[in-house]
Curated annotation (Swiss-Prot):
TM helices/strands, residue ranges: none
One BP annotation, GO: methionine biosynthetic process
Purpose: Catalyzes the oxidation of 5,10-methylenetetrahydrofolate to 5,10-methenyltetrahydrofolate and then the hydrolysis of 5,10-methenyltetrahydrofolate to 10-formyltetrahydrofolate.
Keyword Signal: no
Keyword Cytoplasm: no
Entry protein name: Bifunctional protein FolD
Catalytic activity: (6R)-5,10-methylene-5,6,7,8-tetrahydrofolate + NADP(+) = (6R)-5,10-methenyltetrahydrofolate + NADPH; (6R)-5,10-methenyltetrahydrofolate + H2O = (6R)-10-formyltetrahydrofolate + H(+)
Organism: Clostridium perfringens (strain ATCC 13124 / DSM 756 / JCM 1290 / NCIMB 6125 / NCTC 8237 / Type A)
Length: 277
């Protein structure tokens, strides 16, 4: 039995949906446009922005790549965001983080129009999300839920354990599992008896950024294991879960790479295709 939950496979289907949608739009004389802002020249962010651009172009979405000098003032960055907010041709805005230390990240992200905030960064967007109002879904948590549903894995009534309580993954994922009527426990660095808690999980999600931290001793026989973490070890990308050790015990498991991360950018672009929600 193949135990692999492949984000790549699921992404192929979603990309097809996006491509069909944008072709229909263009046939009617319309188009979609995303503006992506990069401040500075962080290597990881440069790579990610280039990847976003390539994927968007392949799927028929116009992509504006905005590169700003690391020394830009906070005020000028705010002016740029306000300009994009007012531009009716821009359907979505992405601001690559982190920002330079002299810029107040919270103040800047809160300026992004919630109706264009593809990454769900602003406090208005986050508020809408937690209140269950219409908003763009946080992409990494949404990737986890999308992957589970694509493989017809039952969530309702299941015991879910999330290791990690970050604002980007753990907390919004907690809410999304609640919305699916799961019973959810969130673990963190102060959790006592972590192994015992993890062994209760029907679905175990790990998002702590510690390479190979979770081995089979944390996993209940037959559990579904979702690895959100990515770390570089000896030049290779690896996850938070010791894949080889856990594979035999899990009923299904995501690889790293090729799992959750393979879906995130695709779902980010799908966010701008509102009729596909």
């Amino acid at each position: 039995m193949d135990k692999i939950l492949s984000g790549k496979t699921v992404a192929i289907d979603i990309k097809g949906q996006i491509k069909n949608y944008t072709e229909e739009l263009k046939a009617s004389g319309k188009s979609l446009k995303i503006s992506s802002i990069l401040v500075g020249d962080d290597g990881g962010s440069v790579y990610y922005q280039n990847f976003q651009e390539k994927l968007a172009n392949n799927l028929g979405i116009d992509f504006e790549k905005i590169k700003l000098d690391e020394s830009i003032s906070e005020e000028n960055l705010k002016l740029k965001i306000e300009e994009l907010n007012k531009d009716d041709s821009v359907n979505g805005i992405m601001l690559l983080l982190p920002l330079p230390k002299h810029i107040d990240e919270r103040a800047v992200t809160n300026l992004i129009d919630a109706d264009k905030d593809l990454d769900c960064l602003s406090e208005v967007s986050v508020g809408r999300f937690y209140k269950g109002e219409k908003c763009f879904m946080p992409c990494t948590p949404n990737s986890v839920i999308t992957l589970l549903k694509a493989y017809n894995i039952e969530i309702e009534g299941k015991e879910v354990v999330i290791i990690g309580r970050s604002n980007i993954v753990g907390k919004p994922l907690f809410q999304m599992f609640l919305n699916e009527n799961a019973t959810v426990t969130v673990c963190h660095s102060r959790t006592k008896n972590l192994k015992e808690v993890c062994k209760r999980a029907d679905i175990l999600v790990v998002a702590i950024g510690r390479a190979n931290f979770i081995d089979s001793s944390y996993v209940r026989e037959g559990a579904v294991v979702i690895d959100v973490g990515t770390s570089e070890v000896n030049g290779k990308i690896t996850g938070d879960v010791n894949f080889d050790d856990v594979y035999e015990k899990a009923s299904l498991i995501t690889p790293v790479p090729g799992g959750v991360g393979s879906l995130t950018t695709t779902l980010l672009l799908k966010n701008v295709c509102k009729e596909l929600d």
